[in-house]
Amino acid sequence: DGTLKWRFYTVPNPEGKPDGAASDEIFAKAAAKTWSDGEWKESGGGGTVWDSIVYDEDLDQLYFGVGNGNPWNHGLRSGGEGDNLFLSSIVAVNPDTGKYLWHYQETPAETWDYTATQHIIQAELEIDGVKRKVLYHAPKNGFFFVIDRIDGTLISAEPFVDGINWATGYDLNTGRPIENPDARFYKTGKPFIAIPGALGAHNWHPMSYNPETGLVYIPAQQIPQGYDVPVSEIDKKRERLGFNVGIGWSIGQLPDDKDAYRAAIAATTGKLVAFNPKTGKVEWSRDYPAAWNGGTMTTAGNLVFQGTSTGLFKAYSADKGKELLSMEMQSGIVSAPSTYMIDGEQYVAFLTSKGGAFPLVAGVAGGVTRQLPNIPRLVVMKLGGKAKLPALPEKGEVIWEPPVQEGTPEQIAAGKALFGRNCIVCHGDSAIGNGFTPDLRVSGVLGDKDAWASVVTGGALKHAGMVSFGKQLSETQVENIRHYVVNRSRWTKENLPEMTAPTPR
């Protein structure tokens, strides 16, 4: 009847009081003392449970993954002190009462947006001749965890991607990561380019497990990101419409160096990883030229299916990774396939369409995916299917004639900081669009101060999803952002003509 049975908070009450919830006991006993004074008392601290929640019928336990901290910056969030339970943790509770049973925190004192919300798979794994009930987990931080699901003991934590630099591994005696001290940018006061970045070595795109092969198939990716302490007042100030994560966004924007831009494209890649939890090694993998590929599905017929952000739908042999199918789907694929039977005939279905955080913020790192059209479509396949995709609409013409640069170097620099703080998460790094939201470099209002302001602060396009920043940005700030976007339009056209705006269809 919709009556609330129990509630479990993943972060403490900012006033230090009980919540009248199932989590009160464990916070009073252990979790609350892992938090120190900081901005979490204003922001809430984070800890959202937004993806994997699974039930173990045999043990009568409910497991859920907990998200990152808010703000990201642990130095601001909690004064740089404490593990901040239950951020970035797997938590087990009694499903009837919500009573805490156990937890394992994958990233203590989380500060890089390393959520632990990714998919939790229940399995049995033979270890030293004994079958153990375990959880498989491949979160953002790049390590594959095997956890005893009876009591939360860490069994193993091994990398499923290359290049991880925030930690070198895990100490199995303590269950804690062996961190690179440079990764805690708020302690060193120096920028840190982290691998993986905030978008993770594995994000929300589903992974799958095949009991026959014993392998887990992970849609992995390599997306480095720069982290720095917020230096400017713009980055420090919490804003109603701002991305309030407590890092300096300017570090993430590339310098005026075309080689750096092309290096960013080359460094941002995807990979299908077949991971063996028993050995802690990658059994096989297949490289992709871009990140943000679709989830995986594996079947009893020794198959693995996956769509890619470059618009291909692929099938591989599950044991060896031999490519068996590669079909052009006209649009990017971020969803996972599903399969079902009707009258004894098997079907495979999936959705096409670009979407999610990466195409919004990626900028140049979107690489080859930028020019793919965004076509939302349900595709259903079967053996012997005869249907064909309709022809693509004809490409439109992009008119890329940047306005005259009227802004001074000081105005452009100010606009860059403001763009990073207010605009980058929807309109892309360096104002390079990815075909998902408008590419501001070719905006029809870019050359007109008043028209630009009518959109940014006047709400002229609020019906299309562009909110007004009228209560947040001054007239001077809006104009400085325009000067910066004009600068990006002119510079990229001259130095990176291949980074033209996505072609309309």
Residue ranges and their predicted role:
Residues 1-39, 76-115, 123-131, 143-193, ...:
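Extracytoplasmic/lumenal domain signature
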Residues 54, 188-193, 199-225, 258:
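Long, low-complexity segments enriched in small/aliphatic residues
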Residues 65, 138, 219-221, 307, ...:
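Residue-level marker for isolated small/hydroxyl-bearing positions within beta-strands
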Residues 389-411, 424-443:
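His/Cys-centered metal/cofactor-coordination and adjacent catalytic loops
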Residues 394-410, 417-421, 464-505:
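Flexible coil segments in periplasmic/lumen-exposed cytochrome c-class electron-transfer proteins
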Residues 416, 428-469:
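Gly/Gly-Pro-rich "capping" loops immediately C-terminal to redox-active cysteine motifs
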